[in-house]
Structure formats: structure tokens, C-alpha cells
């Protein structure tokens, strides 16, 4: 007999979305819950901010290299639903409405992401709230998904504050079903395992059947310590997560914080490179991800905070079966030559070297 999980829900993977990891811009780490548009109009959570960012992404080249989502995090809503129970944006901060904002973003060749919160506790005690205290969605699931689809939303991040982590195994799939019912293709980003992993090992197979991507660990903060804690957690738990990751299903280590306030140039390069591959741990780390053409993306990462270090990665270690390989530095945009058996490089403190290793075919003489 098939399980109820198999019968009740259409797999989110079947939506055909997120065949590569979604890329874009999200406001939270930089702007948080700044709702003071009267005194700080350029930095508050309002339509002006997201229209400005959409313009920058389209005009400054980000869209051309794959950054396509402009995503609104918490604090966009009014504190009250409409009389018929519909979510609505704060009218003072989004005077044109969310549909108009979606239309503007789409006109730039980009896509709109939005945030909601699911509450699964005793509603008489906890209420239904997002993490910042705005209306949650547990008692309006289909209505809210229909609202998002009607606005033209392309990506949904569903958070889990005020939720019992044990109930997420049924709560999040309820939203999956509601999204599928809308008929609109919407990428589904879940926070599901991030709330469960402190207590138990999440069921990643079930999560991957219902989500396009999922957060696994704490929120990132604007600090190097936060970045390294996420990297360590991923290194410690990669055997649990790697088997289910691939086109349509991705582990989400949270936002890039490059361009904010705390990271040095080398640390920014390190986060960028590591977020691209995420596949080991130690004081000198070697991360690798196989590519579809037989090459391997490799990141050499140094935890040293004082002097540069030489780090070597054997081809066997990174999953390359060839005897020889050509290396190309992705940050320097230059070829480094042919290497035999291993690749090595000098890595700056708290820095990375990121290369593509491409097998060289040795012809018989």
C-alpha cells in the first residue's frame, strides 16, 4: 500500500523549476525590518527599494549572468488582512500594490519573490504570525497561495517561526499542494529543516519532494564568524544532504553577505566560492563539485588569519579520474596550466582559490 504522503501531494520537483540554484537579491540582511519610509525612504521595506534594485539588476549586468529574482523578505505586509481574509501589502509603503510591483519587475526581465510565515502551534496561544509579527498563513493556506499567484509572484520563501518543528512534515506539504493548485509556476523555498535539525535529522527525501530549496541551519549574520559556522555545519552534515540535491532541489546555506559591512575582500571571495560548491572541513578545506561536462569545480579555503598557505588537492580527492588536468582560475580569469595528479595554490588568509579542473585526454603513441 502506498503511503498517504505519496498519494496526497504532487511533488514540488514536478514543477520543473530551479533546475539550477535560484539566484537573485533579497533585502533582509541589509535592510531587516526597517518600515520607516517617512524618515528613511531609501532604506525602508517599500516598493521604491525593490523597484530600485530591479533597475540596478537589469541595468548593471546582474540579470545577464543569471541573477533573476528580486525577493521581498518579512515586514512587507499590513498588520491586518482585508475583510475577506486576504493578505495585503502595507498601503503606505507599497501604495501601488503588489501586482503593480510584480509587473514592474517582470518588465525588467526579472522575477518577484515574496515571504510568508507558517504557524503550526496552538493558534489560541501563539496566533498566526511571521517571524516579525505580521499575519501568518496556516489558516489561509490556499487563499494566500492564490493571492500570490494572482499578483504574479514567482518565488515563495516560507519561514517557520511560531511553529512546532514536528508538525512541519505535514504543514509544509500542505503549502506544496496549495501552490500546485494555483497552476502558476512558483519556486518554493522552505525553512523546514532549519527548525528541525537541532532536534533530529530531517527527512530530506520528503523535503526534496515538496521544496525546490531549503534552509538547513541558522540565519546568516553580517560577520565572518557566521559564515564559517555555516561552512562547518555543512561540512559536518554533508552526507545527509548531498544525496537529495540536484536539479530542482537545492540546499540553501542562506544569503551572500558580500557588499554589506563586515567581510573583507578575501572573505567575500571565500563566501562566494564556497556557496557555489558546498560539498569538507578542517583548517585547510578543499571543496569540490563535479560538473556535467566531466570537469570539477574546486575551492581551496584557508582558515589562517595571519599568513598565506599552500593547499594541495589530489585529483582522487576531488573526484577526478584523469591523470592530467588543466586548471582555470575563476576569480583571476586566467589559465594556470596543466597539472599532474594534484592541484596546488597559495591561498591568502581567510581566502580562497577557485578553479575549474578539466581532464586532459592523453593520446596513445
Enumerate the predicted regions with their spans:
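Extracytoplasmic, non-cytosolic globular domains
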Residues: 155, 160-194
Amino acid at each position: 500500500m502506498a503511503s498517504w504522503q505519496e498519494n496526497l501531494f504532487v511533488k514540488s520537483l514536478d514543477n520543473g523549476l530551479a533546475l539550477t540554484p535560484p539566484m537573485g537579491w533579497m533585502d533582509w540582511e541589509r535592510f531587516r525590518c526597517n518600515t520607516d519610509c517617512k524618515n528613511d525612504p531609501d532604506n525602508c521595506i517599500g516598493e521604491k527599494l525593490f523597484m530600485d534594485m530591479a533597475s540596478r539588476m537589469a541595468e548593471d549586468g546582474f540579470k545577464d549572468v543569471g541573477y533573476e529574482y528580486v525577493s521581498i523578505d518579512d515586514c512587507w505586509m499590513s498588520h491586518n488582512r482585508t475583510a475577506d481574509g486576504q493578505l495585503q501589502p502595507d498601503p503606505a509603503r507599497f501604495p501601488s500594490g503588489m501586482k503593480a510591483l510584480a509587473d514592474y519587475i517582470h518588465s525588467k526581465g526579472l522575477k518577484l519573490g515574496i515571504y510568508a510565515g507558517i504557524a503550526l502551534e496552538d493558534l489560541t496561544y501563539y496566533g498566526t504570525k511571521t517571524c516579525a509579527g505580521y499575519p501568518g498563513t496556516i489558516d489561509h493556506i490556499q487563499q494566500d497561495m492564490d493571492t500570490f499567484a494572482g499578483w504574479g509572484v514567482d518565488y515563495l520563501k516560507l519561514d517557520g517561526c511560531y511553529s512546532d518543528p514536528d508538525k512541519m512534515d505535514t504543514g509544509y506539504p500542505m503549502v506544496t499542494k496549495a501552490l500546485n493548485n494555483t497552476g502558476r509556476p512558483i519556486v518554493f523555498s522552505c525553512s523546514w529543516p532549519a527548525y528541525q535539525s537541532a532536534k533530529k535529522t530531517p527527512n530530506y527525501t520528503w523535503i526534496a519532494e515538496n521544496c525546490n530549496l531549503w534552509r538547513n541551519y541558522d540565519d546568516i549574520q553580517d560577520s565572518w564568524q557566521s559564515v564559517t559556522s555555516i561552512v562547518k555545519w555543512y561540512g559536518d552534515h554533508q552526507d545527509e544532504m548531498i544525496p537529495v540535491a540536484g536539479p530542482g532541489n537545492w540546499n540553501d546555506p542562506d544569503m551572500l553577505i558580500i557588499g554589506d559591512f563586515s567581510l573583507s575582500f578575501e572573505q567575500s571571495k571565500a563566501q562566494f566560492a564556497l556557496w557555489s560548491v558546498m560539498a569538507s572541513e578542517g583548517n585547510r578545506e578543499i571543496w569540490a563539485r563535479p560538473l556535467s561536462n566531466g570537469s570539477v569545480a574546486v575551492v581551496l579555503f584557508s582558515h589562517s588569519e595571519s599568513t598565506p598557505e599552500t593547499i594541495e588537492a589530489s585529483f582522487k580527492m576531488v573526484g577526478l579520474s584523469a591523470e592530467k588536468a588543466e586548471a582555470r582560475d575563476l576569480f583571476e580569469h586566467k589559465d594556470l596550466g596543466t597539472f599532474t595528479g594534484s592541484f596546488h595554490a597559495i591561498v591568502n588568509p581567510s581566502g580562497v582559490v577557485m578553479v575549474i579542473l578539466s581532464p586532459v585526454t592523453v593520446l596513445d603513441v
